[in-house]
Every structure is written in C-alpha cells, then in structure tokens.
Amino acid sequence: MRRPVVKDEIVEFMRHRQEQVTGSLKELENFARKENIPIIPHETVAYFRFLMETIQPKNILEIGAAIGFSALLMAQHAPEAKITTIDRNPEMIGFAKENFAKFDTRQQITLLEGDAVDVLSTLTETYDFVFMDSAKSKYIVFLPEILKHLKVGGVVVLDDIFQGGDIAKDIMEVRRGQRTIYRGLQRLFDATLDNPGLTASLVPLGDGILMLRKNQAEIELPDVD
C-alpha cells in the first residue's frame, strides 16, 4: 500500500531491517513494483511470515489473488496448508495462473474465478485462516459468508482498512469519491470491534490491518443488505 499510516522513518526501518524475500517472491515483488501493481508491503510480509509459521493453518481462503504474491507467500510459510484464492479481474487472473504454474511447486493453491459474493456462496469447506484484500467497501458484505465458513478459533485478516487515515475523520472531511469506501469500513468496524463473538485488533501495518478471531459458532452481525 502506498499510503502508510506510520511515520515514514519507522516504515523504512521495518521494510529494510526485517528479513527480505528471495527467489520467486522477490521476482514477483520486483514485477509488481515495475508494473505498479499493489501487493502487500514488506512490513506486512514479515507479519504474515510470523502468522503462518505460528498458526500453521491447514485450510486458507484468500479474497483477492492479484498476481498471486500473497498466496505464494502463505504457501511458502505454511507448507501443509491448502489455499483457495478468488479473483475476478481477468488481467490479474492471467498473472496469477502463470505464477502459480511456475512457483506453486507443492500444488497447494487453487484459483477460483469470479465475483467473491457469488463464489463464496458456492463454497462447502471450512477454513482456519482467511485473508481479505479486495474491494474495501465490500468487506462488510463478504463478512457474513466468510464467518459461516470460518472454524471457531479461526482468524480473518482484512487489509488496507485505514483508508490512508480517512477512517479517523468525519465523513465531510473525506473526498466524495472515497465516501463509499469510508461508509463500508465504518460499518465493518461497527459490526466487529465490539462484537462479543469476535476478538478484534487493529494493526498499523501498511494502510492498516483488521484482525478477527471467531470465538463462537454463531456470530451476530448487523444487517448488511
């Protein structure tokens, strides 16, 4: 994300001081930078590396494959995991297919094509880790279905939820073109941050991460229609 919410010097320290990616991930990182394709920044990469090696999830769902960088990162650090990733952008799907064919050596990753709203309703499996990195205004729309497919004790990570700092402002201070995202994120926070069925944490990495842990089988959420 190009709008970090932490001081620039701290961001630079985190990006340069923590272990760098190598091999296939470095190749994809360089490609994304050259083509100006958003992928998770290095401070988030380091955090994901820690999460994967600590949690060791067995069944991962990702919303937003892009070029496949984050799915391949998770596969590398959770080698026993099966990963299902969803994307609807034809160009990104093309990149992801190429990269999975080249770098997914353990054949851990399955790519599903289509709008997440439609694809989620067809899933029959349960997951212990979900990564959402797609349309921010739709996070609250996707969440009910995500939670249905999440095991008790499972974790959801939602990326880029600070909107470059806009979420801390009054809506009248937010540019008109960003207000739909703003409203969607505020509804997301209202539904999750004080929800007794969830443990929630806001983490200032990149443009912000929301982490959720599912604590009980049934989670009540406000109507999102």
Can you annotate each of these PLM segments?
Residues 1-131, 136-157, 161-225:
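A short alpha-helical cap/connector motif
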